[in-house]
Amino acid sequence: KPIESGALKVNQSDLSFVKKFSNLVEKVDFFQFSLFKEPVAPLTASLIEKKKINYSQIVKNIKKLEKEYDLLVIEGAGGLRVPITKSKEIVDLIKSIN
């Protein structure tokens, strides 16, 4: 889950929960690139919390993970049309990583 909103702390994120019950040894921030407290769309959360979402870095990080793992399961945030930045939505992220 590269972008998550509605998590009070990193150790309370969805990814932390998955990591707890899996064999992953990497730190959560190795997989999770943007975490927000507000339980709203990523763009809205980033504006409220004044934290920029670096879309191109997220794509780059995911492509790096693709080289390290045989299989990636990537959870989005809401539906396909959920805004990530002012110009990018979840559907764009899917297209960017194929």
What are the roles of these predicted feature ranges?
Residues V28-D29, D70-L72:
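Structural motif
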Residues Q57, K64, L71, G76-N98:
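Conserved catalytic-core segment of NTP-binding enzymes
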Residues K1-K52, S56, N61-K64:
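N-terminal phosphate/diphosphate-binding loop that engages ATP/GTP or pyrophosphate donors
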